[in-house]
Amino acid sequence: MAKQKIRIKLKGFDHKILDQSALQIVEALERTGATISGPVPLPTRIQRYSVIRASFIDKDSQEQFEIRTHKRLIDIVETTSKTIDALTNLNLPAGVSIDIKL
């Protein structure tokens, strides 16, 4: 294949599953002979929500929740002909979102 840079972004709420998926992708790419950089941990996005516990009164009693979105970045610098085939045949867990840009 020609010189083509592929960027893979992984997102998920559980950092352990995200790291396992990134390791699985890196191992599959190394088997094909592709040159990669990463996985690079990107900043975690934290969304915080405050909910009033009582239904009618007592604003002083609130409960806080947060959602943490963890992100990883993998760059494929040099690809081979088997690289894209290896990426399409991967089985990733349900809690991981993957974005591939060419």
Curated annotation (Swiss-Prot):
GO (cellular component) term, any one: ribosome
Organism: Dehalococcoides mccartyi (strain ATCC BAA-2100 / JCM 16839 / KCTC 5957 / BAV1)
Superkingdom of source: Bacteria
Gene Ontology MF term list: structural constituent of ribosome; tRNA binding
Entry annotated with the keyword Protein transport: no
GO biological process, one term: translation
UniProt-listed HAMAP family: Ribosomal_uS10
Entry annotated with the keyword Membrane: no
Complexes and interactors: Part of the 30S ribosomal subunit.
Annotated InterPro entries: Ribosomal_uS10, Ribosomal_uS10_dom, Ribosomal_uS10_dom_sf
Function: Involved in the binding of tRNA to the ribosomes.
SUPFAM superfamilies, sorted: Ribosomal protein S10
Name of the protein this chain belongs to: Small ribosomal subunit protein uS10
Keywords noted in UniProt: Ribonucleoprotein, Ribosomal protein
Similarity field: Belongs to the universal ribosomal protein uS10 family.
Pfam families tied to this protein: Ribosomal_S10 (PF00338)
Gene: rpsJ
